[in-house]
Amino acid sequence: MINFNYETEFSLDNEQAFTDWLSAVIVSEEKNEGEINYIFCDDEYLHKINVEYLNHDTLTDIISFDYTVGNEISGDIFVSVERVEDNAKDFNVSFEEELKRVLAHGILHYCGYKDKSDADAELMRSKEDEKIAMFHVEQ
């Protein structure tokens, strides 16, 4: 089950479309969907988590806590809407595209993808692009 929680004024326009897409992303990686909680927040909220739990005194766009067991992926994914907005501007993409990238990024970590080395980051980026292309909304 995928849940969306809001600790900021932001909210997704079409939660069902995002849920369907993220579920498809999980299936495409041959994983089972457990309980995944997305928590949308601001920089201050996520910075506190970054300092308290990871001992990193920096801003970030996403922090994920992985509770995956075997093939069933579960976890809490915190997303700073402010960072996503700034990154979208920095990368010259729409807010929605950058948001999809971040949402997929969290799932991909749970599927075992890493991004610390250049090679891993390149694979992660490729997987993000692949998963973003899977998103569609029925018109």
Curated annotation (Swiss-Prot):
<feature type="binding site">
    <location>
        <position position="105"/>
    </location>
    <ligand>
        <name>Zn(2+)</name>
    </ligand>
</feature>
<keyword id="KW-0690">Ribosome biogenesis</keyword>
<keyword id="KW-0862">Zinc</keyword>
<dbReference type="InterPro" id="IPR002036">
    <property type="entry name" value="YbeY"/>
</dbReference>
<keyword id="KW-0698">rRNA processing</keyword>
<keyword id="KW-0540">Nuclease</keyword>
<dbReference type="InterPro" id="IPR023091">
    <property type="entry name" value="MetalPrtase_cat_dom_sf_prd"/>
</dbReference>
<dbReference type="GO" id="GO:0006364">
    <property type="term" value="P:rRNA processing"/>
</dbReference>
<dbReference type="GO" id="GO:0005737">
    <property type="term" value="C:cytoplasm"/>
</dbReference>
<dbReference type="GO" id="GO:0004222">
    <property type="term" value="F:metalloendopeptidase activity"/>
</dbReference>
<protein>
    <recommendedName>
        <fullName>Endoribonuclease YbeY</fullName>
        <ecNumber>3.1.-.-</ecNumber>
    </recommendedName>
</protein>
<feature type="binding site">
    <location>
        <position position="115"/>
    </location>
    <ligand>
        <name>Zn(2+)</name>
    </ligand>
</feature>
<keyword id="KW-0255">Endonuclease</keyword>
<keyword id="KW-0479">Metal-binding</keyword>
<keyword id="KW-0963">Cytoplasm</keyword>
<comment type="similarity">
    <text>Belongs to the endoribonuclease YbeY family.</text>
</comment>
<feature type="binding site">
    <location>
        <position position="109"/>
    </location>
    <ligand>
        <name>Zn(2+)</name>
    </ligand>
</feature>
<keyword id="KW-0378">Hydrolase</keyword>
<comment type="function">
    <text>Single strand-specific metallo-endoribonuclease involved in late-stage 70S ribosome quality control and in maturation of the 3' terminus of the 16S rRNA.</text>
</comment>
<dbReference type="GO" id="GO:0004521">
    <property type="term" value="F:RNA endonuclease activity"/>
</dbReference>
<dbReference type="GO" id="GO:0008270">
    <property type="term" value="F:zinc ion binding"/>
</dbReference>
<dbReference type="Pfam" id="PF02130">
    <property type="entry name" value="YbeY"/>
</dbReference>
